[in-house]
Amino acid sequence: MLQKRKINLFLFAAFILLAESVFISCAKKTEEKKAIQEDFSEFEFNGKKLHGKKIQPDYATQFCIYEYEDGFSLIDICGKEKYLIVPEEKYSEGLTCAADGIIKRGMENIYLASSSAYSLWDALGASGKLGFSSIKENDWYIPSASDAMKSGKMLYAGKYRMPDYELLLKSGCKLAIESTMILHVPKVKEKLEQLGIGVFTDYSSYENNPLGRLEWIKVYGEISGCQEAAFSFFNSQANLLKNIIFDSKEIRSSYFYINTRGMAVVRSPDNYVSNMLKCAGSDYLCPKIKNDTDLASRPTLSVSMEEFYKSSKTADFLFYDGNIDPSCTSLAMLKEKNPLLAEFTAVKNGKVWCAKKLIYQDTAEICQIILDMNKIFSAADDKEIFFFERLK
């Protein structure tokens, strides 16, 4: 009897340690930056020195914010770019400073070419300030964005690589929010700036911690003038992760899709999606990367089916990326992609889930997505799962 009690105590202790380690891996606050940042507690603007304090993000590694007197603030994108945010009543054309851009707080008619940012603006109640979109109505999976396009409140203004300059100019657009894809077409950025349209580059895709991605809502809180709402929303969402239920047994999962060449495309070990699964209480399985920092930094890895089978055949759960490959809607269709998939434990046990298209656009719901993953691991009713569908 005593021996049995000792074993139970050992298992309980191991479970507590597992739960703590998984939660810490998700909720670990930012301790190191990827680049040494210059301090901008003092900043010269229009011939005047601004003095303020640095607001360090809790989880994000790609930005920090400086708050100055008189409502001014500076967004430092990890030493890459700096944007001075100027209160509306103090803004005028011709202002000068050492920042890469000067943005009037609360401006409207913004051209959004970073679709993952829309839900953050929406969560702030500020999506009405977004006048233009780089994707068409049918490509939006967030209902409010689709409705805004349908009603004409938000207009299609061309893709990031070929914006409708004439429409933007005619409509008085003064700011474009771009994803890092704009870095591949520098002439477009240059042209926008020549036309008097400032360009703000969103580097949230460089964040590996899912809470780091969500924390970019603080950046858009500064730009929109909804700072308090941004901090409140972020804190309320981060607190949701306290509701995660950890299973006492080890859970293993993998996230993938099969490309047109028949290769398995998996999320790299430290990608934000992989880390979401870890936050939800799972070990993440994928092929090992042998001392290749370039491969490790990529969001996805393309591997042979044999390699994928070797690394993930024992996964308790498989997540299929239906956003990239929407053609897979049943277990039978999954098995048709490669006979090896029929041998996976998760396939045999009917524990394969397909991610809905909404998942990559709805950044504001990252914590809800993690909770969905945790519900899947905890054998919750399928009806309780919103962002994934079980393949049958």
Predicted segments with their positions:
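Bacterial N-terminal signal peptides that target proteins for export
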Residues: 2-12
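Structured C-terminal subdomain patch of bacterial secreted/periplasmic proteins
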Residues: 32, 114, 207-236, 317-392
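Extracytoplasmic ligand-binding site segments that recognize negatively charged/polar headgroups
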Residues: 108, 115-121, 133-144, 184-187, ...
